[in-house]
Amino acid sequence: MIMGQLMNMRELFNKKKLHALVFSMWCVNLHASSLSDGIAIEPFEINAKSNRFVEFKVYNNTDEDYIVTQKVVSEENSIKKAKIPFVVNPPIRLLRKRSDAAMGIIYLNEGEVFDKKRKYYLSVSFIPKKKDSDDLGFNIIFTQQIAVKLSALN
């Protein structure tokens, strides 16, 4: 009789473990699906070549429209106001909800010495488009910086 009760308890315990496992898998799946909504840039690093257009993509997997701005910055630029040898195209654009768009940069080699030590970053900002009905509040601007590597001159 005691053995029968132990077997029933073991079976009940295993069922509870199974229910806990299924519940935790459901929670993880629910959490993962909510992480897929957002804004993103691809790739995570850009390899620029002299006078060539390098494309990257911006993604909007949300139900909001965003104004996207881009520029190339460097550590030296903030200190010395150095000239940035890049052109961005387009510098600003509207990114509709649940869409993606191609953007790009061009490295302009204007006879300057190629310096691999110089660090450049593509700074992309996502500004939520404000609705006319939104009288109060403020928008949160999301900014992401991506390393721009300079390839050897061709």
UniProtKB/Swiss-Prot annotation:
One of its GO terms (cellular component) is outer membrane-bounded periplasmic space. Pfam families: PapD_N (PF00345). One of its GO terms (biological process) is cell wall organization. Keywords: Chaperone, Fimbrium biogenesis. The keyword Isomerase does not apply. The keyword Heme does not apply. InterPro entries: Ig-like_fold, PapD-like_sf, Pili_assmbl_chaperone_N. Could be required for the biogenesis of a putative fimbria. Belongs to the periplasmic pilus chaperone family. This is Protein FasC. It comes from Escherichia coli. The gene is fasC.
